[in-house]
Amino acid sequence: MITVEADISDLWPEQSNWEALAQTACQQAVSVSASDFLLAKDYETEISVCFSDNDTVHALNKTWRDKDRPTNVLSFPMMEAEELAEIKNRVGSECLLGDIILAFDVAKKEALEKGISLENHVTHLITHGTLHLLGYDHILDNEAEIMEDLERKALAQLDIPDPYSDHETGKEGLDG
């Protein structure tokens, strides 16, 4: 079972149910991954999603990734992929997957540039972030292809169009 703890800044428009969107995006990402066993009621899994601002994400990006700019989404896994695989053998395990932090202005700008709703774009960003928490990455082209395919699959199940239809697979990924 996946529990999402959402912290939502006042910047984020109130007309959207960001907490429900985060819950859905996280569950979909887990459901298409090799860690889909975490959806079973025997597992207590928590993901923290922070709907934040550019300044906060900029500071985190500089501190943890040595990139002096805000980005759309950051993920901070609490465990290595190997540790996550071990949990499968321990029914009744509790697992804090990690934190996902979103920058409102970057996400809004990207959604406008792509001509898509902020909600669809944020669903994609949270899906992407959740896959990072599950050990997926896009450093190498083959990794990027696997991760993007999982994102497409999760989003298609939510009737969200392919977010990568306008580019080639690349190492930089969403959170570049």
Curated annotation (Swiss-Prot):
Gene Ontology terms: cellular component: cytoplasm
Family, as annotated: Belongs to the endoribonuclease YbeY family.
GO MF terms held by the record: metalloendopeptidase activity; RNA endonuclease activity; zinc ion binding
Obligatory cofactor(s): Zn(2+)
Biological role: Single strand-specific metallo-endoribonuclease involved in late-stage 70S ribosome quality control and in maturation of the 3' terminus of the 16S rRNA.
Record flagged with keyword Hydrolase: yes
NCBIfam families reported for this sequence: rRNA maturation RNase YbeY
Cofactor annotation remark: Binds 1 zinc ion.
Native source organism of the sequence: Zymomonas mobilis subsp. mobilis (strain ATCC 31821 / ZM4 / CP4)
Main location per the UniProt record: cytoplasm
Claim: Nuclease is one of the keywords in the record: yes
GO biological process, one term: rRNA processing
Higher taxonomy: Bacteria, Pseudomonadati, Pseudomonadota, Alphaproteobacteria, Sphingomonadales
Keywords recorded for this protein, A-Z: Cytoplasm, Endonuclease, Hydrolase, Metal-binding, Nuclease, Ribosome biogenesis, rRNA processing, Zinc
Protein name per Swiss-Prot or TrEMBL: Endoribonuclease YbeY
Residues reported in the UniProt entry to bind Zn(2+): H128, H132, H138
PROSITE patterns registered for this protein in UniProt: UPF0054
Cell location: Cytoplasm
Assigned EC number: 3.1.-.-
Pfam family, one: YbeY
